[in-house]
Amino acid sequence: MFSKSRWLLKDLARLCTILKGVTYSQTDVGTENGIGMLPILRANNINENQLNYQNLVWIKRERISQKQLLQAGDVIVATSSGSKKLVGKSASFLGGKIISCGAFCAILRPNSLINNLFFKYFFQTQSYRNHISSLAKGSNINNLKNADLANIQIPVPPLAEQKRIVKKIEELFAVIDKTVKSLNDTKEHLAQYR
């Protein structure tokens, strides 16, 4: 079904723009929904390849450049943490909010050479995690530099094949979701008989 013969290894820097998250100080921090304030995602808002919007920091809008505002399809990567396990964790931003991320995160904005969903799924692979583990550096805080991200190589098939792969992945996820729901329903039914 899929042909790897036309796949090319491409550096991440050729497939996206890599942006640093917003640097801010305590004097820039304000209250939730305050006038002139925008929310900031931090590394702790990335959980199991999803963004959670709890415990956001709100900072002055003027601290955030236009290009640092997240766009649908952006992938947010944690670039610094006290734990090597947390460095490199990522999630895709689906849109619908005016928001950015903090300086301990990077924003990866895919270009037209790669399908947004194919790009997103790459960051969920064991190959990506292994690569990040080998790159994470530092004694007290593990850091991932933008240059480290830029040099990650991604196997990239032609766009039409990327779309077919994404379609297949999403079909399989739908089967998994249906199976999990069925198992949970069965557990509930069994619990009634105990």
Task: Label the predicted regions.
Residues 1-23, 151, 155-159, 163-166, ...:
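Non-catalytic DNA-recognition/assembly elements of restriction-modification systems
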Residues 13-29, 44-75:
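Sequence-specific dsDNA recognition surfaces
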Residues 25-33, 134-136:
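Short coil/turn segments at secondary-structure boundaries
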Residues 42-43, 62-124, 145:
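A short beta-sheet element
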Residues 56, 103-105, 149-151:
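Short, solvent-exposed beta-strand edge segments and adjacent coil->beta transition regions
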Residues 125-154:
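Specificity-determining recognition surfaces
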Residues 178-181:
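Heptad-repeat alpha-helical rod positions in long coiled-coil/spectrin-like domains
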